[in-house]
Every structure is written in C-alpha cells, then in structure tokens.
Amino acid sequence: MITIQNMHVTLSAHNPMASAFVAALLAGADDAPSTEDAATSAIPPIGAIWPGEGGRNGGLMRGVDGGPNYWLILAEGATATAELAWGGYDQDTGATSDHDGLANTKLLAESGLDFPAAKFAHAARLEGKDDWYLPAIRECRLLSANVPELFETGYHWSSTQYSRNYAWMQNFAGGSQGNGGKASVRRVRLVRRLFL
C-alpha cells in the first residue's frame, strides 16, 4: 500500500514489486528537471537569435496588473523595418497604452483610418509569424536598455499616442524618449511576444 500525506510517501511491503517500482520513481524525482527549468534552459541570451521565434531575444517584459510576463522578440531583416509616418494627425485614437503595443497596434490598424506604421506592423508576415506589432513606449524602453545596438540610429515610433497631434518615440542610441508629430516619417521596428 502507498500512502501520501503532507507530501510524505509511506510504502508498505505487502507488494514488493510495487514498492520497488514506486521507490525507483521517487529516487529519480529530485534529478528530473521541472517543466519550468526545461523552458528556462531553452531561452537564448538577450540579443541572440531565438530559433523558431522569428527574431532576437529583446528581454523579459513584466506583465501589468497581474498579467503574465512575456519575452519580446525583435524582428530581423530588411522587411522588419520601415520609415513611415505614424498617421492620424489631429485624431484622438485611443491607442494610449504605454505598455500594450499589441493592443495599440490592433486598434490603429483596424480603425479604418490611415495609420501607416501600425498597418505595416499589423500586416507583417515574417519568419512564419503573423503576430508582429509596433511596441508601446515602455516596451521600447526595455529594448533600449537591453539591445540598443540592434537598432539603427535615430528615433523610432512606438504605438503609444501622446496627444491628438503627437506620438511617443524612442531613440535607441542615446536612450531618450520624446514625442513627435504624427505626420513625421520615422523608423519602425517590429516585435512580437512569447509567453513561457
């Protein structure tokens, strides 16, 4: 008989075969990697290509309001970048989340209005992935801290609106953030999320 109480296992010797089997299983339990350990060991260093995910590891973004943490994957290659206007000048878009670039991008791209940067991101199909988006300003801040060398010089658009006429942008070379006129053409670089 096997009894489990308060995480303690008691084996009775009534069936030596069953007792030996359970004892062998329990003996190897400490050596077996947990699912979390196995997932963590597969995470490449920040800035390295993440095989099968379509780009480079941009770092771990903390979830907001109890939401799950996620890894930012930074798109690679010529088709992952563009120079575009943010769009929607003199419009209050509602894309004001400073942390949820995915929601901002979807809102802008599906609005039926002209938002070139968000539409570029929303339509992207890169490395077999179709969930690319324009990062929110806090996601840009994380990328600026972790992998500034992976960005070209100059300001890049975020998906976060600042006001009716301005949107947030990030300078990865110097780490500064500011706002620019939505009609201005700036760099765009796509990201996606990976939850583990």
Show which residues each predicted segment covers:
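Short, compositionally biased
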Residues: 1-128, 182-184, 192-196
